[in-house]
Amino acid sequence: MSAVTPLLDGLALRLYIQPKASRDQIVGLHGDELKVAITAPPVDGQANAHLIKFIAKQFRVAKSQVIIEKGELGRHKQIKIVNPQQIPPEVATLLE
């Protein structure tokens, strides 16, 4: 499975999360996953909440349309984005 998979109702992303980074950004490929750096620490779900907010902003969707399907407690996550309104350039190149 690749880092980005198109679905009928959106996209599935396989992510590798780097918490406590200096800034929020989509870094690029990390093996067969998309590396995302976020500023939040991995404490009490702060990193997951921050990740959902960041991804929702990047894809221009509501936070409720970003679903963590696997990896709630780890750095390796699989998320689903329902009907993204915009595709960030880092992700668009992986869809080609």
Swiss-Prot record:
Coiled coil: none annotated. It comes from Yersinia enterocolitica serotype O:8 / biotype 1B (strain NCTC 13174 / 8081). Transmembrane segments: none annotated. GO terms for cellular component: cytoplasm. Belongs to the UPF0235 family. PANTHER family: UPF0235 PROTEIN C15ORF40. SMART domains: DUF167. This is UPF0235 protein YE3436. Pfam families: DUF167. InterPro entries: DUF167, YggU-like_sf.
